[in-house]
Amino acid sequence: MNNKPENILVCVAWPYVNGEPHLGHIAGNNLPADIFARFHRMIGNNVLMVSGSDQHGTPVTIRAKEENTTPKKIAEKYHKVWSDTFKELDFSFDLYTKTGTDNHKETVQNLFNSLNENGFLEEKYSEQPYSEKSEMFLSDRYIEGDCPHCPSRTKGDRCDDCGKDFEPIDLKNLISTIDNSEVTFKSTKHIYLKLPEFQEKLDKWIKSKTYWRSAVKNQSLGFLSNGLIDRAITRDIDWGVKVPIDGYEDKRIYVWFEAVIGYLSASIEWAQSKDNISQKKDIWKEWWLNPDSKHFYFQGKDNIPFHTIILPAILIGSGNYNLPYDVVA
């Protein structure tokens, strides 16, 4: 038993709810996280274990098209499947929630506004992929082309093979994966997160993590070595969290930005729920604002930069929130 219990936040990757869970989902992130959380409870630490369903990702809209229904119906249908599965397997989540809650939307918009007030957001016009055939702007998963930096075929604005970021317009031989048509580009305005302003702080912070797994640390430093670029955090879509500024009513916040905020929004939701036996509505701050607390993120390897680069930048830019203690991937 520890003389002084530690506050341990266990953050488990949020799955896209576009289908049923399989053994890989359970064994990959969730089982190790559950074992870890149970161990820390056994030795007397104050553990908060949270996760939830990522309801706003493109895979959800793709599945909705396949089933000839709405993204909301798909998101709710498979959220229940995932939630019920975790209950049946007796996982010890303090809260398994979803990104469709009002609390999550409010938390995301609050951090968006804080970043904006602190000067870390910027409006830009850019050329974005568009399908004339389907008469719609195309999100990352809907375009495929040749990487401008290596021979690979890739989707979106980042190559998984070489790890480099780029603008979609830099891809060669582009096609729409929706209708297999040639992709054109149209000018549209978006809000960008000024990631280069966090480069120095992130580099120093990551290098200080002497206990991180080498794969996690090396991939993160490699990401930084390529040089951070401004990243759009809004998209021309109608499914997701609304952008809290005028002139963006027809756009939504990009899922990679809002999903990683889910760990914070879930902590706040839990604190306000009947499951919080202390009934202190602000008890979430003991995990998020107390510098002695430790955050552990259980992720797949493809999610490393979102939790070592993107999330820390958001947390640094919007307030004095605790950064990840360890990213387990």
Language-model regions, residue ranges each:
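Structured secondary-structure scaffolds
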Residues: 2-51, 103-106, 172-329
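N-terminal, positively charged nucleic-acid-binding surface of large information/translation enzymes
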Residues: 2-205
